[in-house]
């Protein structure tokens, strides 16, 4: 049986999201911090202890890690081992025997995308397919099938990365907050940029989802997660659900599933 509280850590290129789950699998605490490649294991242990203390949260007894930044994931594992006496489980395609990865090179699939597979299961209902749109440094479209099948997907440039590239190459354009304007037709530079970056990005997401659905042999539910999902909520017409904790919850469910298999 798994030990609780369980610490779930989703390490992205830009942001790291952490959560504590109780014995029912519910997330009782969540945190969102910057991914820092310069922090050593002892630094990370101090940061974790500070997060737990400030929130009045219990110390975890087990941990599961998903990382797309391998050195950072390794440092988290060392921090948990040295200071919390926890052998963290690091997610990969090789250590999930009940998952079928239908890619040319199955071992290349990112750990976060496997977590999204588990997180998407609750949304399948009577359908055989789901698409998770994960808005991060890149925007991932993860296509999964019933029976824990990872079918592939699409990788696109993240909205903030696109905006940063534009600002870097056009010195006279002001840096803006990525939020939806009231109308598509801009009356000033900031408004016009927001329209192009937010509405344009939403149209890309809708268009790619339509293409994915056209290629699948059955209906698919689409679920959005990641920080930028809040910005496009209500704008994207092809997204059915928004779930900011989908990847974390997927980590918890993956851990529980692994414990059941053992």
UniProtKB/Swiss-Prot annotation:
Cofactor note text: A monovalent cation. Ammonium or potassium.
Main location: cytoplasm
Enzyme Commission identifier(s): 2.7.1.33
Catalytic activity: (R)-pantothenate + ATP = (R)-4'-phosphopantothenate + ADP + H(+)
Chain sites annotated for binding substrate: 110-113, 189
Keyword annotations from UniProtKB, A to Z: ATP-binding, Coenzyme A biosynthesis, Cytoplasm, Kinase, Metal-binding, Nucleotide-binding, Potassium, Transferase
Names of required cofactors: NH4(+); K(+)
Subcellular location: Cytoplasm
GO terms of molecular function: ATP binding; metal ion binding; pantothenate kinase activity
Enzyme class: transferase
Positions of ATP binding: 10-17, 137
GO biological process: coenzyme A biosynthetic process
UniProt pathway annotation: Cofactor biosynthesis; coenzyme A biosynthesis; CoA from (R)-pantothenate: step 1/5
Binding site for K(+): 134
Superkingdom: Bacteria
Subunit description: Homodimer.
Protein name: Type III pantothenate kinase
Annotated organism of origin: Deinococcus radiodurans (strain ATCC 13939 / DSM 20539 / JCM 16871 / CCUG 27074 / LMG 4051 / NBRC 15346 / NCIMB 9279 / VKM B-1422 / R1)
Lineage summary: Bacteria, Thermotogati, Deinococcota, Deinococci, Deinococcales
